[in-house]
């Protein structure tokens, strides 16, 4: 499941 990873990476959290 790379959906959660992609969403987290796409998020401006970093």
Swiss-Prot record:
Function text: Venom component which lacks hemolytic or antibiotic properties, but produces an inflammatory response via mast cell degranulation and produces a chemotactic effect on leukocytes.
Subcellular location: Secreted
Lineage: Eukaryota, Metazoa, Ecdysozoa, Arthropoda, Hexapoda
Ranges annotated as spanning the membrane: none
Species: Polybia paulista (Neotropical social wasp)
Superkingdom to which the source organism belongs: Eukaryota
Protein name: Polybine-1
Swiss-Prot/TrEMBL keywords: Acetylation, Chemotaxis, Mast cell degranulation, Secreted, Toxin
Primary localization class, coarse: secreted
Modified residue annotations for N-acetylserine: 1
Any one of the GO BP annotations: chemotaxis
GO molecular function terms noted in the UniProt entry: toxin activity
Tissue-specific expression: Expressed by the venom gland.
